[in-house]
Amino acid sequence: MSGYKVEVDKRRTFAIISHPDAGKTTITEKVLLFGNALQKAGTVKGKKSGQHAKSDWMEMEKDRGISITTSVMQFPYSDALVNLLDTPGHEDFSEDTYRTLTAVDSCLMVIDSAKGVEQRTIKLMEVTRLRDTPIVTFMNKLDRDIRDPIELMDEVEEVLNIKCAPITWPIGAGKEFKGVYHLLRDEVILYQGGMGHTIQDSRVIKGLDNPELDEAIGSYAAEIRDEMELVVGASHEFDHQQFLKGELTPVYFGTALGNFGVDHILDGIVEWAPVPQPRETEIREVQPEEEKFSGFVFKIQANMDPKHRDRVAFMRICSGRYEQGMKMHHVRLGKDVNVSDALTFMAGDRNRAEAAYPGDIIGLHNHGTIRIGDTFTQGEKLRFTGVPNFAPEMFRRIRLKDPLKQKQLLKGLVQLSEEGAVQVFRPLDSNDLIVGAVGVLQFEVVVGRLKTEYKVEAIYEAISVATARWVYCDDHKKLDEFKRKCSMNLALDGGDNLTYIAPTMVNLNLSMERYPDIEFAKTREN
């Protein structure tokens, strides 16, 4: 096997998806701890210790204890090289999260075992379904009182329409949490409390019928023996092919805060999760084994370094090898660029990348020329598909405290919209600026960043907009007529794409009936 193929096959690129507060940032910390990237994990909420979680690094995130932007972390584990994309967990941050899911080959779904399947998880699973992404499941917070584990798995199967195959099974919960039984290894791994900041050297007892188990956990030993007969009869066996098709999820139980069960998941991801997968373009499928370089930009992050007002474009490599100083072709602009200073990430710590392979995420310095969805190749005119914008669900009019700063405001909004923090719309027949987001917190983030990064003080006003749709029509005459008759509802977005701004859903439905030749799209390919 060639050295290149060995490098590609080592890669596992995944994201963590969950509802807010299910423990996603904590699990990210613990995953990094096992990957030796962190020696002592930071604790997230109420950070009196001053140990901010490593993956939450913008000022606002540090203040709130939530992960607002998508961080990228690479670390070795076992024989693999793992790329973990941390996604915003707070319920208001989904568009960035959606797009991040286009750059991974598998996902880890974290569920709060006391609550079960929650709303944001359902929404994120819908996005993974667009590409049938394989899912690994972690039932978290076993150190608290939880719902019945069989009930939890039934809920995942019913609500998320995916079969569950338990890999580990809990013994007790809350104050009585004793550990887990690993079905495939036929061993019990015992839990010790108070070890959250370090890697536990867990005691392992081989075999359910081992008398050592009765000594270690008393009456719980007989209980788990009886329970396992029931569990094996009532659940699915793990099937690797069904997992790769996104039809079945292996399920693990543990506590991220107690640092227990995280290594079991990592073992499963390294063993079963797919290596870098082929990617669709408008004209053909790109295979990771191809020697020529290609990749696409799924996120742009402004000012990762507060000392420098720069922007970094996050690129997923799809084929070929990145080497320092190589020439890349920026397909949308038709330009060749020399890239000598691409970055690899350890959440806010940047290292210069000397080489990177399919599945890796690298950062390109961007002075305003790179957009979300851009493709880079070694000359071939390819365009990767499936990195969409999603129609916002909330809108505000944005206004300046100082009217002389209109130019800076527009510049700031366009840059923030290019990195996906927010969407901006300029109505055709007024000078208003409308900001669209998927959640309220994004509005706060934008005003905060306009102030700190662009020295612009802006305020919001309510506006009667219910939703937005991107407008397309192949017939220019019909499109011109539509523009003429509906100009008061039309705007251009940050990329100058025509958008219908609907004051109510009723208005949108009537317009769709009235103009059947016009396509009103909920998503827009970048």
From Swiss-Prot:
<dbReference type="InterPro" id="IPR053905">
    <property type="entry name" value="EF-G-like_DII"/>
</dbReference>
<dbReference type="GO" id="GO:0006449">
    <property type="term" value="P:regulation of translational termination"/>
</dbReference>
<dbReference type="GO" id="GO:0003924">
    <property type="term" value="F:GTPase activity"/>
</dbReference>
<feature type="binding site">
    <location>
        <begin position="18"/>
        <end position="25"/>
    </location>
    <ligand>
        <name>GTP</name>
    </ligand>
</feature>
<dbReference type="InterPro" id="IPR009000">
    <property type="entry name" value="Transl_B-barrel_sf"/>
</dbReference>
<dbReference type="InterPro" id="IPR041732">
    <property type="entry name" value="RF3_GTP-bd"/>
</dbReference>
<keyword id="KW-0547">Nucleotide-binding</keyword>
<keyword id="KW-0963">Cytoplasm</keyword>
<dbReference type="InterPro" id="IPR031157">
    <property type="entry name" value="G_TR_CS"/>
</dbReference>
<dbReference type="GO" id="GO:0005829">
    <property type="term" value="C:cytosol"/>
</dbReference>
<comment type="function">
    <text>Increases the formation of ribosomal termination complexes and stimulates activities of RF-1 and RF-2. It binds guanine nucleotides and has strong preference for UGA stop codons. It may interact directly with the ribosome. The stimulation of RF-1 and RF-2 is significantly reduced by GTP and GDP, but not by GMP.</text>
</comment>
<protein>
    <recommendedName>
        <fullName>Peptide chain release factor 3</fullName>
    </recommendedName>
</protein>
<dbReference type="InterPro" id="IPR000795">
    <property type="entry name" value="T_Tr_GTP-bd_dom"/>
</dbReference>
<feature type="binding site">
    <location>
        <begin position="86"/>
        <end position="90"/>
    </location>
    <ligand>
        <name>GTP</name>
    </ligand>
</feature>
<feature type="domain" description="tr-type G">
    <location>
        <begin position="9"/>
        <end position="277"/>
    </location>
</feature>
<dbReference type="GO" id="GO:0016149">
    <property type="term" value="F:translation release factor activity, codon specific"/>
</dbReference>
<dbReference type="Pfam" id="PF16658">
    <property type="entry name" value="RF3_C"/>
</dbReference>
<feature type="binding site">
    <location>
        <begin position="140"/>
        <end position="143"/>
    </location>
    <ligand>
        <name>GTP</name>
    </ligand>
</feature>
<dbReference type="GO" id="GO:0005525">
    <property type="term" value="F:GTP binding"/>
</dbReference>
<dbReference type="InterPro" id="IPR027417">
    <property type="entry name" value="P-loop_NTPase"/>
</dbReference>
<dbReference type="InterPro" id="IPR032090">
    <property type="entry name" value="RF3_C"/>
</dbReference>
<dbReference type="InterPro" id="IPR004548">
    <property type="entry name" value="PrfC"/>
</dbReference>
<dbReference type="InterPro" id="IPR038467">
    <property type="entry name" value="RF3_dom_3_sf"/>
</dbReference>
<keyword id="KW-0648">Protein biosynthesis</keyword>
<dbReference type="Pfam" id="PF22042">
    <property type="entry name" value="EF-G_D2"/>
</dbReference>
<dbReference type="Pfam" id="PF00009">
    <property type="entry name" value="GTP_EFTU"/>
</dbReference>
<keyword id="KW-0342">GTP-binding</keyword>
<dbReference type="GO" id="GO:0016150">
    <property type="term" value="F:translation release factor activity, codon nonspecific"/>
</dbReference>
<dbReference type="GO" id="GO:0097216">
    <property type="term" value="F:guanosine tetraphosphate binding"/>
</dbReference>
<dbReference type="InterPro" id="IPR035647">
    <property type="entry name" value="EFG_III/V"/>
</dbReference>
<comment type="similarity">
    <text>Belongs to the TRAFAC class translation factor GTPase superfamily. Classic translation factor GTPase family. PrfC subfamily.</text>
</comment>
<dbReference type="InterPro" id="IPR005225">
    <property type="entry name" value="Small_GTP-bd"/>
</dbReference>
